[in-house]
Amino acid sequence: MTTHNNKRGKERSRKPSEPGIKVFVDHKKALILGQVGKSLAEKSVSSNMKDWYEEYEIACEQIRHENEQLLDGFVALLRNQRLAPRTIKGHRDNVEFFINEFLLYEDAKRPVDGIGEVDAFMGDWFIRKAMWSTPRTIKSTATSLFKFYAYLAALDRITPAELAALKITIAIDLPDWQARCERYNDGDIEDWRGED
């Protein structure tokens, strides 16, 4: 039986190769592509995601502060209209859920930029995310949002045309939103959106 030895008389094994490809950008620095630790691309994406998230959180905090001031003014308006404290609280809570949860859920949007999102909120997101969603709460939330945007129109934050478009959207889509909510809350119906 013969053994193959290298020049030193020991058997020499090759170190198993690590996954990834080393590309030499210059004669000293290797850029590693693949899955050897964290590649530069992964580090860059990770760093960018962290930076983006921090910026998003800062923007959301700023918007929440602005929203609190808007809500205070909105509540003052409702008090001047001599609404009952319970009604005022309901309107405030409905609007706060829309502006501080929905509009900040995926992106940092201010209420003036979110007026076009009312249909997506009422016809889908609210139904799925609010455990208290019923056809009745759909109607009361739509009323709250219209009152809030009427308040923003009085402050010249949105145009009368935007408010009129919202009024039409609510008038036309409210029955559909309520029907979707009823279907969603019925566990026997799979196509709660009514798309089939």
Where is each model-derived feature located?
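Charge-rich, intrinsically disordered N-terminal extensions
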Residues: 2-196
